[in-house]
Amino acid sequence: MSKVLTLLFLLGQSSIYFGQLFTLRGTCQITRSYCGGVAPSPEVYAQHIAPQPYSGKILYLKKGLKNSLKQKTIAQAVCDSNGYFSFTVTPGDYCIVQEEHTRSYRSIIQECKSSYLQINADCIKQWWINGLQSLSIKTHTTLKPLEFHQACFTPGDIPCIMYTGPMPP
C-alpha cells in the first residue's frame, strides 16, 4: 500500500512540474562594422561599434537542443526597443533560432553565393545546427545577451560570410 501511495505521490508531483509554465527571457545586442567613408573621430567610432539593443529582431523557439527542419517553430518573440524578448514555456529542451534557421543551411549558402562573398560552408552548417542558444528549462531563466554582428556588405547578421569585393560606390 505504501508503494502505491508513493507512486501516486510521485506521479502527482511530476504532472504538476510538467504542467508549470516558466518564463525564458533575454536580450539581443548587435554590433556593426565600420564600413568605410570618412574616418570618424575615435569617440564616434567607439559609439558606432559598441553593442546596441537589437530592436525588432525576431526569434523563434524550437523543441530540442539542436536545430532541425523536422522541428517546427513553437513560439516567436520580437525584441522590443531595449532588445528584450521572452517566451513562456513548459519544462524541456529548447533551441532559440532566427529566421535563417527555419530553412536549410544549404539554401542559405546558395542565396549568399556571389563573386564577392566568401562563405565558410562548414561554419554555416555548425551555426545552423546549433542555433543561437540551446538550453534545458526547469525554472524561470534569464539568458546572457544573444550577440549578433552586421559585417560590411553582407546579408543580415549571419556569421561565416565575409565580403571581399571592392568598396561599393
Predicted regions and their residues:
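Short, acidic Ser/Thr/Gly-rich low-complexity loop/linker segments typical of extracellular
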Residues: N67-N82
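Short, linear, compositionally biased motifs with a strong N-terminal bias
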Residues: L10-L11
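Positively charged n-region of N-terminal signal peptides that target proteins for export
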Residues: M1-V4
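Short Pro-Gly-centered beta-turn/loop motif in secreted/extracellular proteins
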Residues: S86-C95, E100-T102
